[in-house]
Amino acid sequence: MEKNNSAKRGQQDGNQQSAQPEKVGWVRKFCGKGIFREIWKNRYVVLKGDQLYISEKEVKDEKNVQEAFDLSDYEKCEELRKSKSRSKKNHSKFTLAHSRQPGNMAPNLIFLAVSPEEKESWINALNSAITRAKNRILDEVTVEEDSYLAHPTRDRAKIQHSRRPPTRGHLMAVASTSTSDGMLTLDLIQEEDASPEEHSTCEESFRVDLDKSVAQLAAGRRRSDSENVKLSEKGRSGTLPRHEVTSWDKPTQRKDSLDKGTVYTPQVPKKLSHSEKNKCASMEEILSRRDSAHRAVLRRGLEAHCTAAEPEQLSRLQELVALKLEKTQELLTEVKGYGEGKRKVKDCATSTTTSSSSSSSRSDCERILQESERLLGEASSTWSQARRVLQEVRELRDLYRQIELQQVDCNPKQSSQYRKSMM
């Protein structure tokens, strides 16, 4: 223990000697009272670390000083002023008061500075030195060699670890909660080489669906017209194919033709996978925030498309309805004619008695019955299709009227809003 303390003390003394003094200068020191006045003597004062050196002459070596005081024995340095004194010395005096501890024999020191500013400078320097001296005493802890703490990682080589770059999932999570309207998320999706179909707007998809429905409607009408014309020509010529299978005999083909004639309905969207949902998350947020703008754009597109295609479609549908009605009437007349022929054939069959004539008449009757049934089925299906076309025409007219009413209602609202904004 004594060896450790002596080693620390020697090291501190060496540090104090090598360090530069904090403050030096000439100050008058109080040396006692005479018969008529106080005795003040000029002294050279050096403040170095926690030691205060006082000498009669200016010296550079601390060994030649006359007095040395340890500031750890003192409590504070403060201004000393008498209340009734009017002398100039009263504004420049300061004292160094010792701490009131048992066994402390350090004297109180009184100094007189050259000016009040110099006095303040000395007070601040001495107080800071006293604080450091007290902290030095508290920080001194002697530890035996046997109780030293071991540091197994002190001599280990230190490696600088660079920061790991953020993962893509973290960037997506930050972008989804950011206030930039999903722009960062859109940039990340574009980096993944997404298809251009995923970035199409609602307005373009609606226009594509509407164009598809109109094209399919027109194609279905033309296809049904061509088939009906061919059938009517074959019926008039009297050549009825026996094993020919038309589109009216197959229920699946009939349903397809009817579906092609009706208005196109969009399919149910398929379920998206987890990765696709992550891709479309930001787009859903943007669309939810801009529902009003998209609705206005969709309404304008619907109105423009209906106004452009409505007159032509109505005229075509009316022509198709007229053709269907004419063909149904022709088919009904043919069915009636075949019914009369059937009766005549039955009368002839009863009058004939030979086996050869009876077999041929039976085959002819069966063929006529089949043809009449087929013609009757075609007539009924054509009639139902014509009724559906009429219903579609009525629905289109109602839709067009509703659009016109909405336009009429929106115009006064827009004009009133414009007037309010002008006011």
UniProtKB/Swiss-Prot annotation:
Post-translational modification: C-terminal fragments could be released during apoptosis via caspase-3-dependent cleavage.
Pfam families xrefs: PH
PH domain location: 20-131
Keyword Iron listed: no
Biased composition (Basic and acidic residues): 222-259
GO biological process terms held by the UniProt record: regulation of myoblast fusion
Protein name: Pleckstrin homology domain-containing family O member 1
Organism listed in the record: Gallus gallus (Chicken)
